[in-house]
């Protein structure tokens, strides 16, 4: 009899041993020297009955802090946003419930159309001409943009702003190390990229210039100035953007960006230990054949009816492994679907209104924090995040706020030693006036 949870019974094991011509597990592993073989029993507890198992995991889950119970002012790349209820309903349908693009695309027209709509909406937001079907997350997309730029320009120097998310820079450096590429960081000045330092670093060996807009500190970057420096030579201009912010801001494509990447988490993807997310990657037609990942295109069949296909597949590793544009094979199709459903449900006007509320509520939070004696650092145009400076140790502030029902902002001292005692505060459209007022009052006690 097969067990509900165990993949292999005693009879199954014996059948497999007979099939390969050995009598026992001991005989199967006989070539492994006795002195390096594990002896004894594994330290694994006895099996639990289903009600006991559910109770055990429920107890573990109860130790987590849930956003339904706390008001979150934590962002730094993962944000608490409104998710339309229809999103979970659609992505739970069996036809869609996979992280992969279909291997027989001609019989998966619904899934391909959903991905095509995702690509189309990303192009609209970014002001670009081509977008792929998604990537693992924003940092992966950023690293792939840098790799593509180096391949396109035949250069090996990558200039990246220190105002780009630290974890995205870590992923970039990991990718660059294996390919012997040079990553040079551009300093910041008052919370934005230092254009003068960029000018000093830029030379004929530069493959790309990478900035984030809005950047990690929440500030809006001077994209026009950075673009003019980036395109002095053959380098590409790469912009990492929060797609929700692009519902309100002038798109990077309008500033001459060659590649726009980011994380679609603000659209329909919940906060969950930092993932899974959904990276997006958009670029120009000129660079279309160098784009990593899958591309869904629209065409017509032999009867003149509209259809969708995976196109330009000669770029991919299953066609030409040695000359592939990247080693990205799977993607985040399910989360891309969630993002597409969220964007379509909220609509153009809704996305703009949602972005506007982020700006307005962040501005209101700033004013309330100031009124409670809190110092705002690196002030200037921002989207939904800003920096505050506190006199008390931030771990004490975080614990005190949690006890009052708030999840504090991000401790910048963890990744920027010079910003010890500085907190990155995020305010999204789901925060209420009452929550912001009370948060400002509680934080003011540590000013």
Curated annotation (Swiss-Prot):
Membrane among keywords: no
Alphabetic keyword roster: Oxidoreductase
Pfam family, any one: GDC-P
Highest rank taxon of the organism: Bacteria
EC number, UniProt record: 1.4.4.2
A GO term for molecular function: glycine dehydrogenase (decarboxylating) activity
Gene3D superfamilies xrefs: Aspartate Aminotransferase, domain 1, Type I PLP-dependent aspartate aminotransferase-like (Major domain)
Coiled-coil residue spans: none
Family, similarity comment: Belongs to the GcvP family. N-terminal subunit subfamily.
Descriptive protein name: Probable glycine dehydrogenase (decarboxylating) subunit 1
Native organism taxonomy: Bacteria, Bacillati, Bacillota, Bacilli, Bacillales
